[in-house]
């Protein structure tokens, strides 16, 4: 727990007060235009009860609020949520939660149909991503999905992420898939993303919480296959 809190401090401090939030507004279209890679992935989410992780100043939240029955905005910085409250003042279906930086508490077990996180997890260290994936399996409903925009750069772990290209932390599509599997989530789709003119700098991964734990499902399939092989064959 202490190590996770230390990682949150390293990753989160730079974004408490940053010019990024104002600058990023002009690039919001990248995530929502139909000819961009993000939109087809997002359209596969069930938005009845959706949470945006690391919502910042709400540039995506503003778009999603009108599409969702229930939208939860989550951020480690209360100041960001204050900005979102102003921005979404006319939306009656939104709740605002400050979180730890490594899990979805206080969100209730099995209460979300979807989670998404854009342009934030690219900076998260692997231990934080692993922790979030484990808790995503807790808060998602069976069959619920989560869409994560993350780094695809196998960066030097001994170098501060802020010194990397576009401040990307250490993560790859393959490693993300491993962490999702360990958390009990199934990868539905994943692809590399070009960012700031840098080929395949990022990854986009869509995961699903199975209605039956995928490891149990594998065991059952193995059992049925074994029984089928042992069954007498009639000629």
Model-derived features with residue positions:
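Class I (Rossmann-like) S-adenosyl-L-methionine-dependent methyltransferase catalytic domain
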Residues: 1-49, 53-106, 124-130, 135, ...
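A short acidic, Gly/Pro-enriched loop at the edge of an enzyme's catalytic core
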Residues: 105-115
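A short SAM/SAH-binding and catalytic strip from SAM-dependent methyltransferases
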Residues: 114-127
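Conserved acidic functional residues
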Residues: 61, 109, 119
């Amino acid at each position: 727990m202490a190590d996770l809190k230390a990682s949150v401090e390293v990753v989160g401090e730079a974004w408490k007060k940053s010019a990024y939030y104002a600058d990023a507004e002009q690039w919001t279209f990248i995530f929502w235009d139909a000819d961009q890679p993000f939109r087809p992935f997002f359209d596969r989410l069930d938005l009845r009860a959706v949470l945006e992780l690391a919502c910042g100043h709400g540039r995506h939240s503003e778009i999603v609020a009108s599409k969702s029955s229930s939208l939860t905005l989550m951020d480690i910085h209360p100041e960001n949520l204050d900005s979102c409250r102003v921005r979404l003042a006319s939306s009656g279906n939104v709740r605002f939660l400050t979180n730890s930086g490594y899990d979805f508490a206080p969100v209730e077990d099995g209460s979300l149909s979807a989670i998404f996180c854009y342009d934030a997890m690219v900076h998260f260290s692997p231990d934080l991503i692993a922790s979030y994936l484990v808790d995503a399996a807790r808060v998602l409903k069976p069959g619920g999905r989560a869409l994560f925009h993350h780094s695809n750069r196998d960066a030097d772990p001994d170098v501060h992420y802020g010194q990397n290209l576009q401040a990307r932390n250490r993560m790859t599509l393959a490693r993300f898939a491993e962490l999702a599997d360990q958390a009990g989530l199934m990868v539905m789709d994943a692809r590399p993303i070009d960012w700031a003119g840098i080929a395949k700098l990022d990854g986009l991964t869509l995961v699903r919480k199975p209605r039956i734990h995928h490891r149990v499902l594998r065991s059952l399939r193995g059992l049925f296959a074994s029984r089928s092989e042992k069954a007498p064959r009639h000629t």
